Design a protein with these regions (language model features):
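Conserved, mostly hydrophobic/aromatic
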Residues: 51, 58, 67-70, 118, ...
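Active-site beta-loop-alpha junctions enriched in small/polar residues
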Residues: 1-3, 69-74, 132-134, 163-165
Length: 175
């Protein structure tokens, strides 16, 4: 998860010198806490750039074929997760998007920025995502797979996980 800083299994206190500790001290609103985990909040352009710059740095400094994200973005559908960021957004625009659409817009902006910076860092590098096998679940967690497939500038490929034995894959072809 490109937004996950730590899980409940991570030590309770990270090093005071860690990038998380430094940023959290200055800008605590850049983070969301959920079930013992801490996540970057993609509502903020700085956060999206931080993730995209990290992906570009990997492409620039290491011999990699590309960057791959798993399917998890927002850790929950719960409106309380990012309620303060959403409230700030609602106050600053004339016609705000509903919460789930706003979250999808944030993640799509993140995905597009990562794509652009990865391509700038290494034009041959690819960028892909493994979305969940159920489009509705993706949309509820912030992933707009349909939009990413419908327009250039988001991903080079999608690689949904194979279903477990006894499960059916719920993907349809979108072109």
């Amino acid at each position: 998860n490109p937004l996950r800083v730590k899980t409940k299994e991570t030590p309770a206190a990270l090093s005071p010198a860690s990038p998380y500790s430094t940023l959290q001290a200055d800008c605590p609103y850049y983070f969301m806490e959920w079930e013992g985990g801490v996540y970057l909040d993609p509502a903020y352009p700085y956060v999206r750039s931080l993730v995209a710059d990290g992906a570009a740095e990997i492409v620039e400094k290491y011999e990699v074929d590309g960057i791959h994200f798993d399917d998890y973005f927002y850790p929950s559908e719960d409106p309380a997760l990012d309620s303060s960021a959403y409230a700030l957004y609602v106050e600053t625009v004339e016609t705000p998007l509903p919460l789930l659409e706003w979250r999808r817009a944030n993640i799509s902006a993140l995905v597009a920025e990562v794509y652009q910076k990865v391509k700038k860092a290494g034009p041959q590098a690819v960028f892909g995502i493994s979305p969940q096998g159920n489009i509705s679940n993706d949309e509820n967690m912030g992933a707009d797979v349909r939009a990413w497939c419908a327009a250039p500038g988001y991903v080079d490929y999608l690689c949904p996980p194979l279903p477990l034995p006894g499960q059916r894959l719920h993907y349809q072809r979108y072109h």
